[in-house]
Every structure is written in C-alpha cells, then in structure tokens.
C-alpha cells in the first residue's frame, strides 16, 4: 500500500493524495453478498431533513459483512481483498471449506491465501475471532462485540484497534484508542490484530467534487445564515455570532458533553482522554 501525491496538472489535482493498493481485487464484488442500497437524501418519511449534509453521490451496493464471525470450527481461506465504498476499511472475501463465502473487515497483514477461523478453539493468530475469555491479556484486538452474538460494534474503521488489558470474573477490560477503558462481557467476541488500511487517514480528496461523489453536501456556517435559520445568524455586516458556538438547535457545540447513557456508566472504568 502506497501513498501517492498527484502532479498538479489541474486545480482539482493539485492537492490530491491517494492511497494506492496493488493487492485489492480489480473486478466486480461477489454478487451473492450484495444488497440494494437506496438513498434518502437525509430525509425522513415526512420528507423533512433529519440528517444534514447528506445527498447525491455515486450509486452503491451494500456489501454484507459478517460481524458475528459465528461459523465455528470450519477453516476459511482469504480469497481476495476488496475495496468497500461503505466504510473506510477494506474487506476480505473468505471461502470456507464447506463452500460458503463471507465478507469480513480485512485485518492488517492478512494476505490472499491465508487461513482464518473462528470459535473457542481457534488459534491465537491475526485475523481469527475468539471470545475475549480465550484471548491472552495484552493482545491487540478489533471488531469487538458489546453483547454476545450481536456482532462487532467497536474498533471497525480503518487502522482501529483496542488492547485487552485485564480479565476478571465475567468481564474483560479493554483499552480503546480514545483512552477509554471499558468492561465488556468475556463471552463477547473480538478479532485478533488491528484493522488494515491505516493509511486512509493520510488521503486528501483535493476538491469539493470528490466529496460530492461520496454523497456529502456542503456545510454552511451559522454566521452566514439568517436569524430564523441559526442562533448565529443575522447582524449588520460580518459578525462573530455574538455567543459561544452552538448548533442550529442551540446546543453548545465545542466541548459540551452529550453522553446520556447512565445504564452503561458502571462499565466505563476510565473516561476517554480530554481533547
């Protein structure tokens, strides 16, 4: 995987930085694991915008990714690595000995032809999925479940990982990249290693149009709006907004804590590092 800066042959190419990978499959994705992906333009069933800055973009199919890794005791071979437009990480197509194929998040260092497996008896090897109870303390993991059997919810994006730092009783303690230390049920599964495509953070799209291809619409500043549209709007001439930065609904937007989940507070051993 290489990071390439394009030559400034035009204004749109001048600032482009691309991540080029020779190991990614160049053909069509596997048809048996594709689903239709319809666009909402950020609107709900009333036609009102509920998610801003969403709309347009290239047509895509959704790749059905196996986040549960529950096909135990059957070895699988990595058939190919693929680009996935729906996420920052690449995906790997596994072919099991019984003929079934599944997509998984591609771990860093996993190559075509590698053998992977999942389950309690799986080897301690990069790319294998095991319950946290069976993973050695100190290991780097990704694609971690929060509820047994629900599927991975933590550390799924490009370059993401967490570290298993302790295990006591029915719970394992995991240190996340944010610095948060959290207890997770030891029966929850995780995949050894870290997510691949860590160079994703180095890319630069280079022009506004590349953002539009990805379905992202422009963000208008509040101070450029009218008072009816935003708390920062209006005023004679250019203003600074006249108050601490807030969202269009008046909620403080820089550094204001918004977490409201008391149910799981007891599972957080240490909060994430203050930014």
From Swiss-Prot:
Map out region (Disordered) in residue numbers.
Answer: 28-58, 223-275
What molecular functions are annotated in GO for this chain?
A: rRNA binding; structural constituent of ribosome; transferase activity
Superkingdom of the source species: Bacteria
Give residue spans, biased composition: Basic and acidic residues.
28-38
Composition bias of kind Basic residues appears in 254-275
> Short name of one Pfam family for this protein?
Ribosomal_L2_C
Q: Which Gene3D superfamilies match?
A: 2.30.30.30, Nucleic acid-binding proteins, Ribosomal protein L2, domain 3
State whether keyword Oxidoreductase applies.
no
GO biological process terms, alphabetically, are:
cytoplasmic translation
Q: Name one GO cellular component term.
A: large ribosomal subunit
Keywords in alphabetical order, please: Ribonucleoprotein, Ribosomal protein, RNA-binding, rRNA-binding
Q: How does it assemble?
A: Part of the 50S ribosomal subunit. Forms a bridge to the 30S subunit in the 70S ribosome.
Q: Which HAMAP family match?
A: Ribosomal_uL2_B
Query: What does the similarity note say?
Result: Belongs to the universal ribosomal protein uL2 family.
Q: Which PANTHER family match?
A: LARGE RIBOSOMAL SUBUNIT PROTEIN UL2M (PTHR13691:SF5), RIBOSOMAL PROTEIN L2 (PTHR13691)
Q: What does this protein do?
A: One of the primary rRNA binding proteins. Required for association of the 30S and 50S subunits to form the 70S ribosome, for tRNA binding and peptide bond formation. It has been suggested to have peptidyltransferase activity; this is somewhat controversial. Makes several contacts with the 16S rRNA in the 70S ribosome.
What name has this protein been given in UniProt?
Large ribosomal subunit protein uL2
Q: What is the lineage of its organism?
A: Bacteria, Pseudomonadati, Pseudomonadota, Gammaproteobacteria, Oceanospirillales
């Amino acid at each position: 995987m290489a990071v390439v800066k394009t030559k400034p042959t035009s204004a749109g190419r001048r600032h482009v930085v691309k991540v080029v990978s020779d190991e990614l499959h160049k053909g069509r994705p596997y048809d048996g694991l594709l689903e239709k992906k319809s666009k909402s333009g950020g609107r709900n069933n009333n036609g009102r915008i509920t998610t801003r800055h969403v709309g347009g973009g290239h047509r895509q199919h959704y790749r059905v990714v196996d986040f549960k890794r529950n096909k135990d005791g059957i070895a699988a071979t990595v058939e190919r690595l693929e680009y996935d437009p729906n996420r920052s990480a690449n995906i790997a197509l596994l072919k099991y000995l019984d003929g079934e194929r599944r997509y998984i998040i591609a771990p860093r260092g996993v190559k075509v032809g590698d053998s992977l497996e999942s389950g309690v008896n799986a080897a301690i090897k990069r790319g294998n999925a095991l319950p946290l109870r069976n993973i050695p303390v100190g290991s780097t993991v990704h694609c971690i479940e929060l509820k047994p059997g629900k599927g991975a919810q933590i550390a799924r994006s490009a370059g993401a990982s967490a570290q298993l730092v302790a295990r006591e009783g029915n719970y394992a303690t995991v240190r996340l990249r944010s610095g948060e230390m959290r207890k997770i049920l030891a029966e929850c599964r995780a995949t050894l290693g870290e997510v691949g495509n860590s160079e994703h953070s180095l890319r630069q799209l280079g022009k506004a149009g590349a953002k539009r291809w990805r379905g992202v619409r422009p963000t208008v500043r509040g101070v450029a709006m009218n008072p009816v549209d935003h708390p920062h709007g209006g005023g004679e001439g250019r203003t600074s907004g006249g108050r601490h930065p807030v969202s269009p609904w008046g909620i403080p937007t820089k550094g204001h804590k918004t977490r409201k989940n008391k149910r799981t507070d007891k599972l957080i051993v240490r909060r994430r590092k203050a930014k």
